[in-house]
């Protein structure tokens, strides 16, 4: 089952990127390999319900159960012991990834307060893009009445692009609303 974004990539994006960058093979064209959603929950040390609620929110947003991340080492200043649950993350690939990106670009991003576009400078130098979301309520799957606290999450989009310019062209072809 291919999604709307997958069909858009195969029918339009590949041809556009070959024309723009002059790739010799279709396999050279950059593609999105995975999307990772990460929610850091430092305040979960005192309350275990926070982790459960965050896992529930991420499950609704991603459509897949996240893994609870645990502290690698103890940090006395933050009252964290090794092995304490301090976050949740989920990695999306193939059709779930494209479905999430479709919902993120078309539904969630326009719901951000005072939204003027996403930064074009958040690339890491190797063609990957990171975006932070301050509130999980921008996603339509999250019901405002049922959340206990506003939590942000980090979205990492990993691509096969060699440069930031190629990655930006790829994401722009997927209608990512860049500011500049």
Curated annotation (Swiss-Prot):
A Pfam family reported for this protein in Swiss-Prot or TrEMBL: Ribosomal_L5
InterPro entries: Ribosomal_uL5, Ribosomal_uL5_bac-type, Ribosomal_uL5_C, Ribosomal_uL5_CS, Ribosomal_uL5_dom_sf, Ribosomal_uL5_N
UniProt-recorded Gene Ontology molecular function terms: rRNA binding; structural constituent of ribosome; tRNA binding
Transmembrane segments: none
CC annotations in GO: ribonucleoprotein complex; ribosome
Function: This is one of the proteins that bind and probably mediate the attachment of the 5S RNA into the large ribosomal subunit, where it forms part of the central protuberance. In the 70S ribosome it contacts protein S13 of the 30S subunit (bridge B1b), connecting the 2 subunits; this bridge is implicated in subunit movement. Contacts the P site tRNA; the 5S rRNA and some of its associated proteins might help stabilize positioning of ribosome-bound tRNAs.
Protein family: Belongs to the universal ribosomal protein uL5 family.
GO biological process: translation
Assembly: Part of the 50S ribosomal subunit; part of the 5S rRNA/L5/L18/L25 subcomplex. Contacts the 5S rRNA and the P site tRNA. Forms a bridge to the 30S subunit in the 70S ribosome.
Name of the molecule in the record: Large ribosomal subunit protein uL5
Keyword vocabulary terms for this entry: Ribonucleoprotein, Ribosomal protein, RNA-binding, rRNA-binding, tRNA-binding
Stored SUPFAM superfamilies: RL5-like
């Amino acid at each position: 089952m291919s999604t709307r974004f997958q069909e858009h990539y195969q029918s339009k994006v590949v041809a556009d990127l070959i024309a723009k960058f002059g790739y010799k093979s279709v396999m050279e064209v950059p593609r999105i390999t995975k999307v990772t959603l990460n929610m850091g929950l430092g305040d979960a040390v005192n309350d275990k319900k926070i982790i459960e609620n965050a896992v529930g929110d991420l499950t609704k947003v991603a459509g897949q159960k996240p893994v609870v991340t645990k502290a690698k080492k103890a940090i006395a200043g933050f009252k964290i012991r090794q092995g304490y649950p301090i976050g949740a993350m989920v990695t999306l690939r193939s059709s779930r990834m494209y479905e999430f990106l479709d919902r993120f670009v078309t539904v969630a991003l326009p719901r951000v307060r005072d939204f003027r576009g996403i930064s074009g400078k958040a690339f890491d130098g190797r063609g990957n893009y990171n975006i932070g979301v301050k509130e999980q309520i921008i996603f339509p799957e999250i019901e405002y009445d049922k959340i206990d606290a506003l939590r942000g999450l980090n979205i990492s989009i990993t691509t096969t692009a060699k440069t930031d310019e190629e990655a930006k062209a790829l994401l722009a072809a997927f209608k990512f609303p860049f500011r500049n």
